[in-house]
């Protein structure tokens, strides 16, 4: 069978290793596995969400409200925008897919930082587009504008806070990049971890309303991180109505499940779970910073729910990741991104205790 030629240059996305894999390969009991690889919320599921799922388990045979009216209403109140400014996806990943399919072809190019979310490249390559990267993982105005003028990309991706590095770009710098490009280039501002950045430093906080005046900008958000709904797959894009209307032409019917829709609506009602998640994170990440300093390890200042450790020539990220995996500790090796480092989700106090104990033994 002959497949589309563009597939020859696409690598399959590699998700964080699941607990089940460690159980199968190393015979470690599930309760003894500590997964700090996928930036999941360590608190778990909001009890209010669990209640909604249990109360509605008997309607799984019904299709959801395809207009997603209640969720759009909830998001419009949350972000002070109109329903017509919102598109819902099965995770913000799906909105990225809509964007690529709507705008890109084999004559297009896209611009992103040297190290950033892998799905930008994958979705662009699926459409045959060329990938342009800046020199650094940081979203620097000079680098982006120079590349923009050289290549005239159809899409610019600004992931802030950035995954997998954890750094953030200031609101001022983001707006400067946006205002430095013309309206034929779409700027995607991916705020998947924005709740963490906003809690740490308002200078790096970006709200959808900061961007809505630009006709060529879309803001992406998700319920997967601070809201703890990674397994429910709900994300959204917020932009001017004209852009949203065009993206809707890419959306399949019933792209959000009935239960996912209901729990996302519930998640918008109360911020206490998000606040508790961020409070735990802010408390525990200090331990990772202290541990790194005490052990001579470099790290990138994080505005997310994870931290990135960078190693010198005396340590190897692949060897460390593999050794920890055999001990039942799952972290994300960044070798595939060209970095000698690892990304570690900030867990609970108990999970972090386990990580520090095993990591110290491995590096010694």
Swiss-Prot record:
Q: Which reaction does it catalyse?
A: L-histidinol phosphate + 2-oxoglutarate = 3-(imidazol-4-yl)-2-oxopropyl phosphate + L-glutamate
Q: Cofactor(s) for this protein? A: pyridoxal 5'-phosphate
Complexes and interactors: Homodimer.
Q: What is its EC class?
A: transferase
Show the PANTHER family listed in the entry.
Answer: HISTIDINOL-PHOSPHATE AMINOTRANSFERASE, HISTIDINOL-PHOSPHATE AMINOTRANSFERASE 2
In which pathway does this enzyme or protein participate? Answer: Amino-acid biosynthesis; L-histidine biosynthesis; L-histidine from 5-phospho-alpha-D-ribose 1-diphosphate: step 7/9
State the EC number(s). Answer: 2.6.1.9
Kindly provide the name given to this protein in its UniProt entry: Histidinol-phosphate aminotransferase
User: Secretion signal: which residues?
Assistant: none
- Coiled-coil intervals, chain numbering: none
- What keywords were assigned to this record? Amino-acid biosynthesis, Aminotransferase, Histidine biosynthesis, Pyridoxal phosphate, Transferase
Pfam families, A to Z = Aminotran_1_2
Modification N6-(pyridoxal phosphate)lysine, positions? 225
Fetch the Gene3D superfamilies from UniProt.
Answer: Aspartate Aminotransferase, domain 1, Type I PLP-dependent aspartate aminotransferase-like (Major domain)
What are the disulphide bonds in this sequence? none
Record-stated family: Belongs to the class-II pyridoxal-phosphate-dependent aminotransferase family. Histidinol-phosphate aminotransferase subfamily.
- BP term (GO), one: L-histidine biosynthetic process
Q: Name one GO molecular function term.
A: pyridoxal phosphate binding
* Amino-acid biosynthesis among keywords: yes
**Domain of life here?**
Bacteria
């Amino acid at each position: 069978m002959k497949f589309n030629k563009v597939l020859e240059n696409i690598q399959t996305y590699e998700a964080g290793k699941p607990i089940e894999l460690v159980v199968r390969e190393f015979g470690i009991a599930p309760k003894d596995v500590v997964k700090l690889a996928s930036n999941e919320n360590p608190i778990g599921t909001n009890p209010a969400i669990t209640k909604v799922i249990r109360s509605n388990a008997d309607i799984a045979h019904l299709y959801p409200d395809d207009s997603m009216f209640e969720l759009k209403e909830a998001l419009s109140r949350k972000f002070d925008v109109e329903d017509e400014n919102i598109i819902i996806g099965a995770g913000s990943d799906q909105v990225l897919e809509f964007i690529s399919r709507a705008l890109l072809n084999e004559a297009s190019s896209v611009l992103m930082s040297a190290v950033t979310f892998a799905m930008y490249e994958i979705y662009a390559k699926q459409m045959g587009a060329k990938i342009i990267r800046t020199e650094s993982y940081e979203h620097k105005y000079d680098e982006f504008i120079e590349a923009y003028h050289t290549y005239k990309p159809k899409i610019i991706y600004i992931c802030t806070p950035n995954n997998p590095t954890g750094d953030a770009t200031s609101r001022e710098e983001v707006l400067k990049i946006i205002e430095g490009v013309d309206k034929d280039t779409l700027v995607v501002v991916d705020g998947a971890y924005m709740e963490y950045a906003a809690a740490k430093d308002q200078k790096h906080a970006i709200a959808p309303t900061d961007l809505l005046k630009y006709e060529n900008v879309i803001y992406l958000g998700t319920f997967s991180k601070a809201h703890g709904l990674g397994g429910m797959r709900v994300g959204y894009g917020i932009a001017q109505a004209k852009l949203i209307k065009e993206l809707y032409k890419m959306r399949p019917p019933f792209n959000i499940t009935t239960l996912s829709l209901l729990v996302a609506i519930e998640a918008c009602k109360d911020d206490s779970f998000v606040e508790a998640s961020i409070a735990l994170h802010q408390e525990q990440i200090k331990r990772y910073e202290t541990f790194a300093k005490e052990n001579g390890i470099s790290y990138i200042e994080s505005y997310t729910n994870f931290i990135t450790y960078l190693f010198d020539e005396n340590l190897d990220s692949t060897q460390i990741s593999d050794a920890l995996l055999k001990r039942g500790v799952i972290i994300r090796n960044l070798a595939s991104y060209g970095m000698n480092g690892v990304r570690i989700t900030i867990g609970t106090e108990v999970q972090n205790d386990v990580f520090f104990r095993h990591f110290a033994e491995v590096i010694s």
